[in-house]
Amino acid sequence: MLTIYAVSDSIGETAEQVSKATARQFKERVDVKRVTYIRTFEAVDDFINSIKDPENSMLISTVVLVDIREFLVERCIERGIRIVNVLGPCISTASRVLKTTPTYEPGAVWNMDDRYYKKIEAMEFAMRYDDSKDYNGIKHADVILIGLSRTSKTPLCMYLANKGIKALNVPIMPEIPIPEELFEVDRTKLVGLTIDPIRLIEIRKHRMNKFNQLSSEIQYANGERVLEELEYADKIMRRLRCKIIDVTNRAIEDTALLIMEAIGYNGFRES
């Protein structure tokens, strides 16, 4: 089940209507919850911290207050929550056509510099190719993360996107061949993610318990299966001769820093 949070710094009607229109496109259950008058950093923190299932949640935001909007995006990235700003592209396009700067409440002027657009482009890229079987993005990525399920690939891609880095992730499973495209790209763009087997089992068991998947995915957290996956992933990473980073008990920010160092990132990514 997906929960869409319609977030606004006003009454939230627009965000809710867009959220409901989105939900109606799917047969699966999608809940829509309106979150209104998000106008302070404290309100953002309280709201984001209240989300119990980040992986199965997304935000559709119409927040226009710049500081609050930026902070909301940062907090979403920290928790691996996907966010879509509805008004941003509309206002930006109108502004370019009118050749003028849009105004909001005092001090709330939309940041339309080159870095902002690169960040948005990178975030859209990360969401488009997240755990995807569409590998067309590999040749356009600044970094390609490869690793087993539950090695933080998605939140890392979103965090890197906030730095303007186009990050794509490729899941590794013994039953599924890795794409040949990985052998054709500059290997300095490849980063393998590994993890301690005991920690990986804990993470997977926690996920299974949360979604009551003990019967259908019993092998997912089985010790022998996890060791088999890790051994297979290690062989793949060595074949690719890529940088390998251990994410065990490491914060997203710390792992992202190591990734940025590995690819030679020393500032906002330029095209």
UniProtKB/Swiss-Prot annotation:
Keywords: Kinase, Nucleotide-binding, Serine/threonine-protein kinase, Transferase. It is an enzyme of class 2 (transferase). The keyword rRNA-binding does not apply. GO terms for molecular function: ADP binding; ATP binding; phosphotransferase activity, phosphate group as acceptor; protein serine/threonine kinase activity. It comes from the Bacteria. ADP binds at G147, L148, S149, R150, T151, S152, K153, T154. Pfam families: Kinase-PPPase. It catalyses: N(tele)-phospho-L-histidyl/L-threonyl-[pyruvate, phosphate dikinase] + ADP = N(tele)-phospho-L-histidyl/O-phospho-L-threonyl-[pyruvate, phosphate dikinase] + AMP + H(+); N(tele)-phospho-L-histidyl/O-phospho-L-threonyl-[pyruvate, phosphate dikinase] + phosphate + H(+) = N(tele)-phospho-L-histidyl/L-threonyl-[pyruvate, phosphate dikinase] + diphosphate. Its EC number is 2.7.11.32, 2.7.4.27. Disulfide bonds: none annotated. Bifunctional serine/threonine kinase and phosphorylase involved in the regulation of the pyruvate, phosphate dikinase (PPDK) by catalyzing its phosphorylation/dephosphorylation. PANTHER family: PYRUVATE, PHOSPHATE DIKINASE REGULATORY PROTEIN 1, CHLOROPLASTIC. Belongs to the pyruvate, phosphate/water dikinase regulatory protein family. PDRP subfamily. NCBIfam families: PRK05339.1. This is Putative pyruvate, phosphate dikinase regulatory protein.
